[in-house]
């Protein structure tokens, strides 16, 4: 099932999702480094990465929602897409709450702030797996004419426009 939100022939959601996943996961890593080294600069940097991750997650959600709405009803893909989407709303909420708790003092986050981010990271592993299931097993966002020798997507877009 082809994506309904594409740029230059590729699904926008798949292009954007690397930003929140990378930024949010790295903010967790920086929490761990800060705890191991007692270096508050890692906590502060993680705080800013977390904020950018939340914002980029909201941006990635828009084309994801567009693609979700195009999935046929009463399919396994629709059910998994729903759990994936709701789960990612929860992930974003957990990280946003952690970010808010850190806002006044990003160099020394509370245990609650670290716990919320850790919970968000754990949930993101599951929702990321669901996203992989949608694409890799169920073909959501995959071009209908995809095959091992398919022409590049830019060439295909020019052929369609002609």
What positions do the PLM features span?
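Short amphipathic, positively biased membrane-proximal segments
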Residues: 1-162
């Amino acid at each position: 099932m082809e994506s309904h939100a594409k740029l230059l022939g590729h699904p926008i959601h798949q292009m954007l999702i690397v930003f929140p996943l990378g930024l949010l996961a790295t903010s967790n890593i920086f929490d761990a480094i800060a705890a191991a080294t007692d270096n508050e600069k890692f906590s502060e940097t993680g705080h800013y990465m977390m904020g950018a991750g939340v914002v980029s997650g909201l941006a990635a959600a828009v084309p994801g929602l567009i693609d979700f709405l195009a999935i046929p009803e009463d399919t396994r893909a629709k059910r998994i897409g729903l759990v994936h989407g709701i789960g990612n709303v929860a992930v974003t909420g957990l990280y946003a709450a952690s970010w808010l708790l850190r806002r006044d003092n990003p160099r020394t986050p509370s245990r609650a702030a670290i716990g919320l981010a850790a919970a968000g990271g754990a949930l993101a592993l599951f929702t990321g797996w669901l996203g992989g299931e949608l694409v890799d097993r169920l073909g959501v966002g995959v071009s209908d004419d995809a095959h091992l020798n398919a022409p590049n997507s830019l060439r295909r877009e020019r052929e369609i426009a002609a």
